Design a protein with these regions (language model features):
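Sec-dependent N-terminal signal peptides
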Residues: 3-17
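Short S/T/G/P-rich N-terminal loop/turn motif that feeds into the first structured element of a domain
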Residues: 19-203, 208-230
Length: 230
């Protein structure tokens, strides 16, 4: 049955997705106490000014919620056209970067790869503070249009960023999809939640049309650094 849901997701995905298939890989890890500034400086020295074929990467710090790490890196870009422009870094450059990074990392966590199915077009880095929801979507043929409609018609508030997508290679628990909501800060995020709740008719329509969803949890994070562009 899950294979059927996956096939349905594929067919729907190409109808509502961005103009190209955008993918991401996220890697969680624990940074040694007090080492965040040094780690950020290392990323600056290696990635700042580098040209990407498409997309780029974020260095993020976990804030609230139960997650597997204190920080994470998110690489993103077009499928088949991501990563640095050829010749930007040598093999020796990468080896030194990874060796230097190990000095600041206490423990490595899990990694997942998936797709960014839809975005409202707001640059995530312009917001900086995000809440992410993870869920097992049992009826993607219902969820995708319902969630897209809510983003486009009902949830826009003070230029907030909204996007969602799938986990395709590796996943946290039984999660198949994720949804992200970005604001300027925690207080702005809470105001957005109140704004959504003040439109109970739209909220009721969303929950009644999105199909069966098993919500698995949520957490918040801050985007510390951006290299490349969304």
């Amino acid at each position: 049955m899950k294979k059927l849901f996956t096939l349905l997701f594929f067919s729907l995905f190409f109808n509502i997705a961005l103009s190209q298939t955008n993918t991401f890989t996220v890697q969680y890890f624990d940074v040694k106490p007090g080492a965040q500034s040094d780690l950020a400086a290392l990323y600056d020295s290696f990635f700042e000014g580098v040209e990407f074929k498409s997309g780029g990467l974020y260095l993020e710090r976990m804030d609230r919620g139960d997650v597997s790490g204190t920080h994470r890196i998110v690489y993103f870009g077009e499928l088949g056209n991501s990563g640095m422009v050829e010749g930007s870094k040598t093999r020796a450059d990468w080896q030194k970067f990874y060796a230097d990074r190990r000095e600041f990392i206490e423990k490595r966590g899990p990694s997942y790869t998936g797709r960014i199915a839809y975005s409202n077009g707001v640059d995530p880095f312009s917001k900086g503070y995000f809440q992410l929801y993870e869920a097992e979507i049992l009826e993607p043929e219902k969820f995708i249009p319902a969630h897209t409609k809510a983003i486009d018609n009902d949830w826009a508030y003070e230029g907030n960023a909204m996007l969602f997508g799938s986990y395709d290679v590796g996943n946290p628990g039984t999660a198949t999809h994720w949804a992200a909501f970005g604001a300027d800060n925690l207080q702005s995020l809470m105001k957005w939640k109140l704004y959504v709740e003040e439109n109970p008719e739209a909220l009721a329509e969303y929950f009644s049309t999105r199909g069966e969803v098993i919500e698995l949890g949520n957490f918040s994070l801050q985007i510390l650094k951006q290299y490349g562009g969304f």
